[in-house]
Amino acid sequence: MFDEKTYIEREGKLKDGYIRAAAMTPKIKVADCEYNIENIKSLMSEAHKKDTAIAVFPEMCITGYTCNDLFLHDRLLNAAIQGLVDIKKYSETTPGMISFVGLPYEMNGKLYNVVAGIMNGCILGMVPKMYLPNYGEFYERRQFTPGFNECVYVDVDGEEVPFGSELLFTFNNNRKVKIGVEICEDLWTPQPPSIKHAMNGATIIVNASASNETIGKDTYRKQLVSGQSARLVCGYVYSSAGGGESTQDIVFSAHNLICENGSTLAEAHKFADESVYADIDVERICSERRRMSTYAVDENSTYTEVQAQNFINKELELIRYFDKAPFVPSDKKERDSRCEEILNIQSYGLKKRLEHTNCKNAVIGISGGLDSTLALLVTVRAFDLCGFDRSGIHCITMPCFGTTDRTYNNAVKLTKQLGCSLREINIMNAVRQHFEDIGHDENNHNVTYENGQACLLYTSPSPRDC
């Protein structure tokens, strides 16, 4: 039996605000619950060994999504509940990890498409699918009833379990981690439940899905998941059905995704039925939401928070990739587009200022380095946009101790090729006089030495002096 006290004692703090999530697709056979359960348990064990805190499985993974009218048979429904109980008991062997699994569930004579959250030997809650597709290749309303928001309690294996869409799964050891659930089609609607989840505090959305493949749908799906994570400023874990489903009408590719605030952290290869893992930065999510003054929490919340026990909270070796140059795209075409955008933003800003002040002259200190070169290029484009003569751009080069032939020559050549005015002011004697005034040895190359040159470099002539 799970010993919470022992578990808490061996756990540390959430390492740097990250929590590990997995989107998993088990091998299944349609309507073979026993076979499916064994494969789900196997993946749960695999995820737990990798210190995963959140494991998400596909829609209807206990029975298979493509059971069609078999969903109306008691034998399959009872097998699904027995499978859920089996997973609940097995979760005692994966302490600290919450697993989300999909199954059909009958209540008051109605059949619901639900996802159950399971952890440490308990069924924490069950969330029904709100939007049932009944168009094209889908006809879920033939068997299922749309879910509802209100939280009610249902009996599962002698355990009172909260049931409803407005559930958030929270944890004892970190209140910043709040999980909301939506199911497949819910995300594709004009007003997904995840919007309300996030406005009521959810920092991570999990989606148990059975999304089929058509030409181009994978690209749209990825944009949808990534875009929703950006719009809601959240982590989004999306698990989809795979090759074990029936292909009578549709084909599934197990296109599993994990996104965070608009970035794709992990993506499965289609048709590989593979699991993907990622470390979600919950601290960053909370920080971004604090920064956004328009991100308001619903004050009239009717949500029920399901209190879970402590999740896996070790100091982990991050599996997340960090780009050494996060603001510089690696793709040349995208990089060129980004540079053009930067140049336009700065140039049009300067153009407005020049026109507003009726100024046709600009003075720029040119060192031959990156900063002054960019400033010159921006000014040149702004002058071109205004229709001004480039000779009104007065480039001043001020050589001193630190000036090399390379940077000096770069500054001179760049200015001449762009058709700007050039003036050279050697500040070496002025800097020496400054050092003499303050009693500093020019051979002592410390901060004072650097600042002495910098002070005079910022003393540029005005346009009228040029």
Label each region the model flagged.
Residues 1-365, 376-377, 381-390, 422:
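Enzyme catalytic cores with a strong preference for nitrogen-chemistry domains
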Residues 57-58, 398, 462:
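Hydrophobic alpha-helix-in-membranes signature
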Residues 275-277, 307-323, 388-450:
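A conserved beta-strand->alpha-helix junction
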Residues 360-372, 430-431:
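A glycine-rich phosphate-binding loop feature that marks nucleotide/adenosyl-phosphate handling sites
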Residues 366-379, 407-410, 438:
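Short glycine/threonine-rich loop-to-helix capping motif typified by GTGT followed
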Residues 458, 463-466:
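Single conserved hydrophobic/aromatic residue that forms the stacking wall/gate
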